[in-house]
């Protein structure tokens, strides 16, 4: 069996694209091989500057094969038959026919002769290279090919020999290159083992998994050796894996003068901008140390550490300057600047947005002065120098500036946390922060949908699905008893260009997101039976109904309801139940139970005690079973029949006060 080695050597590829490229090229090569009936073992390795394919168990030749291609019916128009013949360069007389479903069809038998695999591999390779779609790609120089970064070399070896192929301006060879620390030393290789070994000798670890393991082990060992804690950060690990061909973990220190900065500023500078790992003491407190991954083992590691500390110091010096500039102004004084900051082209500026948020907060919690103050100031930090440089610190810098001004802790916390939750795993805000977060998200959701930014199957650029889920989680976690229909109406009316169509669209969207949220824990039929725009109420009902229907009594009662509902069908039942028309004991007993439990069920619903309401409904099981077993609803006397239908209607209406049982 034969072996193929391919390397696409380029300038540095973005780290966040490498893992997808590894999976993508593996799938593409595997699929194309299978389509050509080449069943090989395929591996793909991706690093900062190279994508490598290693395929083994390749046959020397491909077997001859025949493929039947179905053509038109023999009764098809002559033009269609001639077109099929022309496409396959044959005459009609040369085409065999086959009977399919009592109809004769022409067929063309495509024969493929056996070929040496090295003849078709260049075609396969070029097809695979072109088939992978990068999120972004580029042209360079005067060349016609397009790729993620400029390609500099193609190595392609089949069974120890260069496989003749060309991609754009590049002709395949047997050369690869070592790490930049080795001055990109040219390495001539013969096969995969030789290739991997020579790369390792020249400070390139081919396997992504090995680089990741080295980084994780190095981070943990170095942190432990200094009795420090490193928090798990798989996303950052994945990124630095894509930045280093030969990773070495080193320890640096933050200069003392920068420790007066908020820890979030330090963390953002290190993690987001420098790709450094923050360290904490055993009690979880932030420490002035960090770990970073060097791309290569340098003879003077201390010089590398000093260089990284110097780069970090430059960035933190800027942050310190920005912070001092910002605190010279109050959050209130920045409100005028928000008029120049656009929220959305169709929805005005951020000053207008905070006015709407303030109105919504006042609607939700009238006379809550701290909430209103937080609402007015919650976006002021967006026009600060710090947030301009570190956008991920929005809200956080507002919190520190509010504290610096002497505003109380409740206001500062609300400003900080009103962007939460930013995803399903994020913590939820509480207190005034929860109300402010709700108001902000609701205004964004309503406004952007009015502006025509409703999410589609192909995109949700403003993350409105996430915003809606955030609203739902805030309401449920904080048990906010809100009439969401009224709240949406209020929010919509804050916009001039609103309509009933907008309202219906927003409510429908919100209900769908609520269904999406609840279906993790409840059957969709249960959700449809109880969902309304009071989500706390909906949650109580779901819990009660789920527990109720697990029991046999609940299942039997549901069946009884369905039987009653089916008997009524589409009939419009009018009129009250007349007890004087009862002629059997079961219908008398059933009516007595209904009269007894009806006010109790209404009281239980008012108290939101849905378990009690369902238990009261359970007391109908015996009399309703007796009724169905012993009473003929469609009596020969129309008055009696109508009265019994009214009795069943009473039962269904009583059930429907708790939930829409017809949806179960």
Swiss-Prot record:
InterPro entries membership: DALR_anticod-bd, Gly-tRNA-synth_bsu, Gly-tRNA-synth_heterodimer
Gene: glyS
Pfam family, one: DALR_1
GO biological process: arginyl-tRNA aminoacylation; glycyl-tRNA aminoacylation
Residues passing through the membrane, by range: none
Protein name per Swiss-Prot or TrEMBL: Glycine--tRNA ligase beta subunit
HAMAP family (alphabetical): Gly_tRNA_synth_beta (MF_00255)
Single GO MF descriptor: arginine-tRNA ligase activity
Principal location class: cytoplasm
């Amino acid at each position: 069996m034969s072996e193929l080695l391919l390397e696409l050597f380029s300038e540095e590829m973005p780290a966040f694209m490498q893992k997808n490229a590894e999976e993508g090229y593996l799938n593409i090569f595997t699929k194309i091989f299978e389509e050509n009936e080449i069943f090989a073992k395929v591996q793909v390795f991706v690093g900062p500057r190279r994508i490598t394919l290693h395929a083994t168990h390749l046959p020397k030749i491909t077997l001859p094969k025949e493929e039947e291609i179905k053509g038109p019916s023999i009764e098809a128009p002559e033009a269609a038959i001639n077109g099929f013949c022309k496409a396959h360069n044959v005459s009609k007389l040369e085409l065999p026919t086959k009977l399919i479903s009592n109809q004769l069809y022409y067929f063309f038998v495509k024969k493929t002769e056996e070929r040496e695999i090295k003849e078709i591999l260049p075609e396969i390779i070029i097809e695979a290279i072109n088939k992978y779609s990068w999120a972004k790609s580029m042209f360079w120089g005067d060349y016609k090919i397009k790729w993620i970064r400029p390609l500099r070399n193609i190595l392609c070896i089949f069974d120890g020999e260069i496989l003749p192929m060309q991609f754009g301006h590049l002709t395949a060879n047997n050369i690869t290159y070592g790490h930049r620390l080795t001055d990109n030393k040219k390495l001539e290789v013969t096969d995969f083992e030789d290739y991997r070994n020579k790369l390792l000798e020249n400070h390139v670890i081919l396997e992504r998994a090995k680089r990741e393991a080295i980084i994780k082990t190095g981070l943990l060992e170095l942190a432990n050796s200094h009795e420090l804690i490193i928090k798990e950060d798989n996303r950052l690990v994945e990124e630095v894996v894509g930045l280093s061909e030969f990773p070495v973990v080193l320890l640096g220190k933050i200069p003392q003068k920068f420790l007066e900065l908020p820890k979030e500023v330090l963390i953002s500078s290190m993690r987001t901008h420098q790709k450094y790992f923050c360290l904490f003491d055993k009690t979880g407190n932030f420490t002035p140390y960090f770990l970073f991954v060097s791309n290569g083992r340098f003879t003077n590691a201390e010089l590398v550490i000093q260089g990284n500390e110097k780069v970090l110091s430059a960035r933190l010096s800027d942050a310190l300057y920005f912070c001092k500039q910002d605190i010279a102004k109050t959050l209130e004084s920045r409100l005028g600047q928000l008029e120049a900051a656009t929220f959305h082209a169709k929805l005005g500026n951020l000053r207008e947005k905070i006015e709407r948020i303030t109105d919504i907060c006042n609607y939700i919690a009238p006379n809550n002065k701290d909430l209103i103050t937080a609402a007015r100031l919650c976006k002021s930090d967006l026009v600060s120098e710090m947030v301009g440089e570190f956008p991920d610190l929005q809200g956080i810098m507002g919190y520190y500036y509010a504290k610096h001004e002497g505003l109380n802790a409740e206001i500062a916390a609300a400003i900080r946390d009103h962007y939460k939750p930013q995803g399903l795993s994020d913590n939820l805000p509480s207190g005034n922060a929860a109300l402010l977060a709700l108001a902000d998200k609701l205004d964004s959701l309503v406004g952007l949908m009015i502006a025509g930014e409703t999410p589609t199957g192909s995109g949700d650029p403003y993350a409105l699905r996430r915003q809606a889920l955030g609203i739902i989680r805030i309401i449920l976690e904080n048990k906010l008893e809100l009439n969401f229909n009224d709240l949406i109406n209020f929010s919509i009316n804050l916009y001039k260009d609103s309509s009933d169509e907008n309202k219906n669209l927003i409510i429908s969207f919100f209900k769908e997101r609520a269904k999406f949220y609840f279906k993790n824990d409840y059957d969709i039929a249960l959700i449809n039976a109880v969902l309304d725009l009071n989500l706390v109420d909906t949650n109580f009902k779901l819990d009660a109904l789920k527990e109720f229907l697990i029991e046999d009594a609940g299942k039997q009662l549901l069946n009884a309801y369905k039987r009653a509902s089916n008997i009524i069908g589409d009939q419009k039942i009018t009129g009250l139940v007349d007890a004087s028309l009862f002629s059997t004991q079961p219908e008398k007993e059933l009516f007595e139970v209904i009269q007894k439990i009806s006010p109790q069920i209404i009281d239980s619903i008012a108290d939101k005690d849905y378990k009690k309401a369902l238990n009261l409904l359970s007391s109908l099981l015996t009399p309703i079973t007796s009724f169905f077993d012993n009473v003929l609803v469609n009596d020969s006397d129309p008055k009696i029949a109508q009265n019994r239908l009214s009795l069943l209607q009473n039962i269904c209406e009583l059930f429907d006060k708790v939930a829409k049982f017809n949806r179960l």
